Amino acid sequence: MSDADLTNAKSTSLACAKQVVETVPVLMRLIRSGVRSQGASISLPQLRVLGLLSRQPGASVSDVGIHLDVTTPTASALVDRMVKKSLVQRKEDPSERRRVILTLTAAGKDLLEDSRARAQSLVAHLLALETPEQLNKISEGLSLLADAAQAFQTSKKS
């Protein structure tokens, strides 16, 4: 690859990154406001915790804090509220007595599925006016972005 090709690729990469960084928050605000307006009975940080526990059953309160970028005491208070709502269950880790693991309850799973369905419905409504070709382009672009993010995360772990 020539220097000009590398410069062009970097410029294109930066332009694409700018577009992603500007678009994702707009979409997230739209989804959050839509989920809220449809009567969600949970805060967005709590919804994020449900998502984390769905992907990583047995996560700890510290894991929740890292995921939300909050202190462990803040995460613990949030989890306490979720336990009181019967959305999350705390259990002693059988392999490490001082560690508490978190799992979703049936009510937590149901609420997460309902919230995801609401969000998907909202996005489907947003995309309803697009042509099949545009929808394919959007889908392909999102798949490429998800693959790139996954590859980046994997490379950071090794």
Model-inferred region functions:
Residues M1-S41:
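N-terminal leader segment of winged-helix/HTH proteins
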Residues R29-R32, G58, D147-Q150, T154:
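Generic structural signal for secondary-structure transition and capping sites
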